[in-house]
């Protein structure tokens, strides 16, 4: 039987996961190495809803001893569907913040690539709307920036 680790979200939810799942987070892996998990691992900046998504990703990505090309392709397909679901449920950025906080590089990279794909080919106004960023430049300041960076608009 594999060793279990208790993860405690910021809003008080607890999740019992296998150590192989938990150690995909470098942050948690270091806590396990330092023997700091006896009373559970508090994940201060991550709610239960988001932590459950992170755990779902980590469970799917527990490395098998001999992954086949077929299993790699299936995982890529699963990743794409997972990211699409996060995007549609408006939890993508929260999951990315959690991945960064927990140091889960592959999940953070996947999230960053998803955001890059989302903004590719979009105009600044569209990107601001998509990411919820307020434009705090005056029209004059925008024009000045366009002139200074003309090469980027060619």
Swiss-Prot record:
One of the protein's GO biological processes: response to jasmonic acid
Residue span of region Interaction with the F-box domain of F-box proteins: 96-154
SUPFAM superfamilies: POZ domain, Skp1 dimerisation domain-like
Database matches in InterPro entries: SKP1, SKP1-like, SKP1-like_dim_sf, SKP1/BTB/POZ_sf, Skp1_comp_dimer, Skp1_comp_POZ
Pathway info: Protein modification; protein ubiquitination
UniProtKB keywords: Nucleus, Ubl conjugation pathway
Cellular component aspect of the GO annotation: nucleus; SCF ubiquitin ligase complex
Expression sites (tissue/organ): Mostly expressed in inflorescences, and, to a lower extent, in seedlings and siliques. Also detected in cotyledons, leaves, pollen and seeds.
SMART domains in the cross-refs: Skp1
UniProt subcellular location: Nucleus
Recorded superkingdom: Eukaryota
A Pfam family of this chain: Skp1_POZ
UniProt KW DNA-binding keyword: no
PANTHER family: SKP1
Protein family: Belongs to the SKP1 family.
Subunit and partners: Part of a SCF (SKP1-cullin-F-box) protein ligase complex. Interacts with ADO3/FKF1, EBF1, PP2A13, SKIP15, SKIP16, CPR1/CPR30, At1g55000, At3g61590, At1g67340, At1g78100, At3g04660, At4g38940, At4g39550 and At5g49610.
Chain's role: Involved in ubiquitination and subsequent proteasomal degradation of target proteins. Together with CUL1, RBX1 and a F-box protein, it forms a SCF E3 ubiquitin ligase complex. The functional specificity of this complex depends on the type of F-box protein. In the SCF complex, it serves as an adapter that links the F-box protein to CUL1.
Protein name (Swiss-Prot/TrEMBL): SKP1-like protein 13
Species for this entry: Arabidopsis thaliana (Mouse-ear cress)
